């Protein structure tokens, strides 16, 4: 019985690390210049049409950028922007925006 509980706990712990992203926030900052027109210099958008990126979860940003890039999610502005991003670019941008303080 103890071994079954141990295996179950191990599976839960293993599954909880699925959202870990190994991006480079410094490289993400360099790449973020193209994002600032809509999402703001510090990831805080001045227009309510575009979401704030500052403080956003890395895994969420990675998933959404992949969806835009791969055509799963479409937007007239984001889809062409995301199509230029490599997997490393996406990870780096996600790390950068996750490290910024979320807006008010």
Segments the model singles out, each with a brief description of its role:
Residues 41, 70-71, 100-103:
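Generic structural signal for alpha-helix termini and adjacent loop/cap motifs
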Residues 35-41, 93:
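The canonical Cys-X-X-Cys-His
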Residues 27, 60, 77-80, 92:
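Extracytoplasmic/secreted proteins, especially bacterial periplasmic and envelope-associated proteins
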């Amino acid at each position: 019985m103890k071994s079954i509980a141990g295996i179950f706990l191990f599976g839960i712990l293993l599954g909880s690390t699925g959202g870990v992203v190994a991006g480079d926030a410094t490289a993400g900052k360099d790449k973020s210049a193209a994002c600032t027109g809509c999402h703001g210099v510090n990831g805080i958008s001045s227009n309510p049409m575009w979401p704030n990126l500052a403080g956003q979860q890395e895994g969420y940003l990675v998933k959404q950028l992949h969806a835009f890039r791969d055509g799963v999610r479409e937007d007239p502005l984001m889809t062409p922007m995301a199509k230029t991003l490599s997997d490393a670019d996406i990870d780096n941008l996600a790390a950068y925006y996750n490290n910024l303080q979320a807006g008010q």
